[in-house]
Amino acid sequence: MAAAWPSGPSAPEAVTARLVGVLWFVSVTTGPWGAVATSAGGEESLKCEDLKVGQYICKDPKINDATQEPVNCTNYTAHVSCFPAPNITCKDSSGNETHFTGNEVGFFKPISCRNVNGYSYKVAVALSLFLGWLGADRFYLGYPALGLLKFCTVGFCGIGSLIDFILISMQIVGPSDGSSYIIDYYGTRLTRLSITNETFRKTQLYP
């Protein structure tokens, strides 16, 4: 009687074949071929906010004539419309992937603005120059005690008036409520710089 041929591989061979198949599948999906396939078919589109400088242009903010600050200034922040360059494809502020032609708004960029409360820089300087010896500048800025003291001492015999004029002109002394002066948006403003954790410090190179 002839021996029958085995109908399939033995148990060890079957386990080995399955293990090799699993390893091959993992190497294809996670290796360089899988990365190429993912980048070719499933690459996520870039957000418009992450575009590089030169790939978009932003409009100048609309300035309020009364406050000389952007009209939508809230919590020291305003937003301006930004337009991606033509032939740029990215996700807009609504999350929709869009191919831009240069005329569509892609995102709104936040810009810093100041809190003002009706105190004009020009008025403060004029009061300090002409009526500083009467304390009018201090009364205007919300310092009634110092204003009364200057009034009673004729501006500390003129010395206090001169010091106040310098401090107000340099925008060191401001309104008592902590707000900023109303100054022309594109005029001369004092910008205070501070060092934070994000400040880039360039190494000094000496010859």
UniProtKB/Swiss-Prot annotation:
<dbReference type="GO" id="GO:0097190">
    <property type="term" value="P:apoptotic signaling pathway"/>
</dbReference>
<keyword id="KW-0053">Apoptosis</keyword>
<keyword id="KW-1133">Transmembrane helix</keyword>
<dbReference type="InterPro" id="IPR007829">
    <property type="entry name" value="TM2"/>
</dbReference>
<feature type="topological domain" description="Cytoplasmic">
    <location>
        <begin position="150"/>
        <end position="153"/>
    </location>
</feature>
<feature type="glycosylation site" description="N-linked (GlcNAc...) asparagine">
    <location>
        <position position="96"/>
    </location>
</feature>
<comment type="function">
    <text>May participate in amyloid-beta-induced apoptosis via its interaction with beta-APP42.</text>
</comment>
<feature type="glycosylation site" description="N-linked (GlcNAc...) asparagine">
    <location>
        <position position="197"/>
    </location>
</feature>
<feature type="topological domain" description="Extracellular">
    <location>
        <begin position="40"/>
        <end position="128"/>
    </location>
</feature>
<dbReference type="Pfam" id="PF05154">
    <property type="entry name" value="TM2"/>
</dbReference>
<feature type="glycosylation site" description="N-linked (GlcNAc...) asparagine">
    <location>
        <position position="75"/>
    </location>
</feature>
<keyword id="KW-0472">Membrane</keyword>
<protein>
    <recommendedName>
        <fullName>TM2 domain-containing protein 1</fullName>
    </recommendedName>
</protein>
<feature type="transmembrane region" description="Helical">
    <location>
        <begin position="154"/>
        <end position="174"/>
    </location>
</feature>
<comment type="subunit">
    <text>Interacts with APP beta-APP42 (amyloid-beta protein 42).</text>
</comment>
<keyword id="KW-0812">Transmembrane</keyword>
<feature type="glycosylation site" description="N-linked (GlcNAc...) asparagine">
    <location>
        <position position="72"/>
    </location>
</feature>
<feature type="domain" description="TM2">
    <location>
        <begin position="118"/>
        <end position="166"/>
    </location>
</feature>
<dbReference type="GO" id="GO:0001540">
    <property type="term" value="F:amyloid-beta binding"/>
</dbReference>
<feature type="signal peptide">
    <location>
        <begin position="1"/>
        <end position="37"/>
    </location>
</feature>
<comment type="similarity">
    <text>Belongs to the TM2 family.</text>
</comment>
<feature type="transmembrane region" description="Helical">
    <location>
        <begin position="129"/>
        <end position="149"/>
    </location>
</feature>
<keyword id="KW-0732">Signal</keyword>
<dbReference type="InterPro" id="IPR050932">
    <property type="entry name" value="TM2D1-3-like"/>
</dbReference>
<keyword id="KW-0325">Glycoprotein</keyword>
<dbReference type="GO" id="GO:0004930">
    <property type="term" value="F:G protein-coupled receptor activity"/>
</dbReference>
<feature type="glycosylation site" description="N-linked (GlcNAc...) asparagine">
    <location>
        <position position="87"/>
    </location>
</feature>
<dbReference type="GO" id="GO:0005886">
    <property type="term" value="C:plasma membrane"/>
</dbReference>
<feature type="topological domain" description="Extracellular">
    <location>
        <begin position="175"/>
        <end position="207"/>
    </location>
</feature>
